[in-house]
Regions:
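Bacterial Sec-dependent N-terminal signal peptides
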Residues: 4-40
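First exposed extracellular module after export/assembly in secreted or surface-exposed proteins
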Residues: 26-176
Length: 176
């Protein structure tokens, strides 16, 4: 009986003394990201849409800057790009050419938006999501200050992504 007990203890000791170095020899692999999904959303007040030409700039699937005019109060865009890449969004506001506001007129400028970026591996495993929220809510902007106010509230968001999923602020030549 003692012999059986000693053999059991010896067997357990051998198992317990196994190679614990396997983690040092095989460090965990960093995830490699292959694509970036960018979602842009904007909500514009009807009053702002009536008084301003609003142009949205963004990076397309090929990494080129494209733009479009907002003609409705809601914008939703989803773009998928290969990583490494640059992504982002810019929004410009200019007073409509046929609008000649006076100092006595008052305008409310209201918009909100969100840019969400998520990197994915080739197996579609998502990495860290980044949300950038922006917007403006100004009440009673005088008509004679409208153009100046709108020009000071251009939105520019730009990021670069690398294959290891790291994101950094960058600059993009938007073309305006």
């Amino acid at each position: 009986m003692k012999k059986f007990l000693y053999l059991t203890i010896a067997a357990l000791a051998l198992v317990a003394c196994g190679d614990d170095d396997h983690e040092e020899n095989n460090p965990p692999q960093e995830k490699q990201y292959t694509k970036l999904v960018t979602r842009a959303n904007m909500d514009i007040s009807q009053e702002l849409l009536n008084i301003a030409d609003i142009t949205v700039y963004y990076m397309n699937e090929a990494g080129e800057v494209v733009n479009e005019r907002m003609t409705s109060p809601v914008l939703e865009k989803t773009v998928t790009q290969p990583i490494p890449c640059k992504t982002g969004m810019a929004v410009t506001f200019t007073v409509k050419p046929d609008l000649n506001p006076t100092a006595e007129e008052k305008f409310d400028i209201k918009y909100s938006g969100k840019l969400t970026t998520t990197p994915y591996t080739k197996n579609n495993d998502p990495g860290a999501m980044l949300n950038k929220v922006f917007g403006l809510d100004l009440k009673g902007v005088r008509g004679d200050k409208l153009a100046e106010t709108l020009s000071h509230h251009t939105t520019k968001i730009a990021y670069t992504y690398t294959a290891d999923g790291k994101q950094a602020d960058t600059s993009i030549q938007w073309g305006f």
